[in-house]
């Protein structure tokens, strides 16, 4: 809720400072995240009702009718823009499903407290080609029986339609990474979203120098970009800057 409220405030500030324009970069990032979670148009009124109920509970009498009307207008301006972008992103996919089944075909320890999972499709659903730097959502049941989603960068073979590769770092206080690393084994089937991501290697034929700056497990999208460049035999000049707590 805090992230959502912050995004709406940033959107409002942009409208005030740049009349007649939209914050395209911010909207694109949010839209890619939404589509990776399977968010659809029908859910926006539900979000609106709950968000504005929470605002009223916290701010009380400060939320006058005029204030409520102003922020309602901002919310729906932002929502309508996102809905349009998200419909476009969904239409670009090879299937119309939010989640498809993928089978774990390999599970490999990678560095310090990280594991690389390799998946192949568990059925004949057409699959989309991802982009280096992009990500997929993983959805699985956690200990309380509820389904949780997390996004993981494609760390290798991002453009494949027959394989997905992600590298997961263990977050001992988390819900999803411990379940993946400790409970999911080769042969298991889990749900993945279609690939999304707004910071990707768009122009694979470019010869312009490329700088990649990463830290920790954030190396994974950069690894996918390097893999894609290597696969196409690119002679592009690349500078990788990486910081980590361990040489492992």
Predicted feature residues:
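FNR/FR-type flavoprotein reductase catalytic core
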Residues: 47, 178-248
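Charged, low-complexity, helix/coiled-coil-prone segments
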Residues: 1, 6-23, 74-83, 124-129, ...
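Short, functionally important structural connectors and interaction interfaces within domains
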Residues: 22, 31, 122, 172, ...
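Ferredoxin-reductase
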Residues: 95-189, 230, 244-246
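Generic structural "secondary-structure junction" signal
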Residues: 29-32, 39-41, 156, 178, ...
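Globin-like tetrapyrrole-binding proteins
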Residues: 1-99
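Generic detector of short, locally flexible boundary/turn motifs and exposed helical patches
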Residues: 16-18, 66-72, 81-86, 102-103, ...
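Alpha-helix initiation and capping sites
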Residues: 2-5, 130, 148, 216-219, ...
């Amino acid at each position: 809720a805090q992230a959502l409220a912050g995004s709406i405030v940033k959107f409002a500030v942009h409208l005030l400072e740049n009349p007649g324009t939209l914050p395209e970069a911010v909207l694109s990032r949010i839209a890619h995240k939404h589509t990776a979670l399977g968010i659809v148009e029908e859910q926006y009124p539900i979000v609106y009702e709950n968000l504005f109920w929470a605002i009223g509970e916290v701010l009380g009498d400060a939320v006058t009718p005029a204030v409520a009307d102003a922020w309602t207008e901002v919310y729906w301006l932002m929502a309508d823009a996102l809905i349009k972008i998200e419909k476009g992103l969904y239409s670009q996919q090879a299937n119309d499903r939010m989640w498809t089944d993928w089978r774990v075909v390999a599970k490999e320890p990678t560095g310090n407290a990280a594991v690389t999972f390799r998946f192949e499709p568990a059925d004949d659903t057409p699959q989309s080609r991802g982009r280096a730097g992009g990500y997929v959502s993983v959805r699985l049941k956690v200990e309380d029986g509820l389904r949780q989603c997390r996004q993981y960068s494609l760390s290798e073979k991002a453009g494949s339609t027959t394989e997905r590769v992600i590298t997961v770092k263990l977050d001992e206080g988390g819900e999803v990474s411990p379940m993946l690393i400790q409970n999911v084994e080769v042969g298991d089937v889990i749900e993945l979203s279609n690939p999304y991501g707004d910071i990707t290697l768009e122009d694979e034929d470019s010869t312009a120098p490329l700088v990649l700056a990463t830290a920790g497990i954030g190396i994974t999208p950069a690894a996918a970009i390097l893999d894609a460049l290597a696969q196409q035999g690119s002679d592009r000049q690349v500078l990788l800057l990486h910081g980590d707590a361990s040489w492992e």
